[in-house]
């Protein structure tokens, strides 16, 4: 066995010790470097994550806010940008500075069409992007069965809470959504009659009545929230005359405007979509029940304090400005009141610094001259679309646009293209941007017992009643008329006709027609014709029915086939 000398052993241990120190030093050095590199990598990752999060927030912030403002029963002369809105000297007929701003800076939809020109189905078109024949509430589908399977579109095309609406589509995009003002579209207690109707002469200060009104209001709020709206307030379940209590049958645009402003205040830091609907200039329009009314009277009951959103003092301010403009009467005070409400939204958007990223739509729910029918005076309406800096198309869009097109267009403008094929409506975003736009080759309309299609300047118009109604005896027609008259009298309105032999209406199957269509019944020369054909270019007032003119036989055939195509894609029957 070989022995190691102590001196060599000491040297070896010393060598190992020195090398261990070097190794440890290197290890610590590289470990430190590794920690530094790891920290730097983590820091970079955090920076990248933070950058990504900031980019996501920036992208979120770039989503345009949407304000969809829908007015009620406006006439063409109420828009100063039109020839009908000016007097013979070219001066504006109305004091509407905010609407004038929309005309100057936004896009006027020159050929704005409404599918179903009365309140409820028009709102259905806007909020769903679909034709009202697709309504699925129980009263609508039951009524279809009683009419031999033919859908009859009236004030019955309610949206059932839970169905997809403008609200739900925008919620899916990360928007906060609001619903303010007139409802008349989301089904709730007030529509289906599950709660006892307060007496017409009930006292809104009576504790029992207050309790009932509050119950109805909160149930309506819940149903609207179920329909895709985070915020639902300052609501009218219907027009003031239909609230069930005479003492509440007053307009209150201040209250509605307050709801819009409160919504913007609450959700100004989020992308938001606000649907706001006024009850004017629909009746009641007499000063005492409209612009001169007590601002504490609302659909919810009597407020303790009046809203303080619009120019103050409200009545005096409107009166003074209208008198200074020399425009008293003819409901122009109500138009200024309406304009003030739109102006209040603009001011709030500007104050909160979100106006530059907001798209505003102003839409009149339907034509008023022949409301309740598919004549041009009913289906022609008015609308603006506004955004800061305008759209490339300029101030006027000539392309025909339907109110079912609003929802897909707004979704398209908000960056959602995946849902665009789910609607009867079509996006016209490309037209607004001045790009190539195929547009529509025809326009479809439906209301009551009538259907119509417009193509290449011609309109085919058909009216059909169930066979059992056409076989009615005189006594049955008389009974129908009496029931309808009692119904109108139940909410303070008068009977329309007293003649059981009068032709049925197109909207309501009663002799002499219903209230909404009565103007057309009295004044349209071909109202009672079951088949009508018009050359809209040469006969825009639809006075000459060409249905039996052999010269237009081929045109009629083409239009009938076009109408059949629409009807075959929708629920219900309609015989052409």
Regions found by a protein language model. Name each.
Residues 82-83, 106-131, 138-144, 179-191, ...:
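Short, solvent-exposed turn/loop segments enriched in Gly/Ser/Thr/Pro and often Arg
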Residues 133-138, 195-236:
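Acidic, His- and aromatic-enriched active-site or binding-groove loops in soluble protein domains
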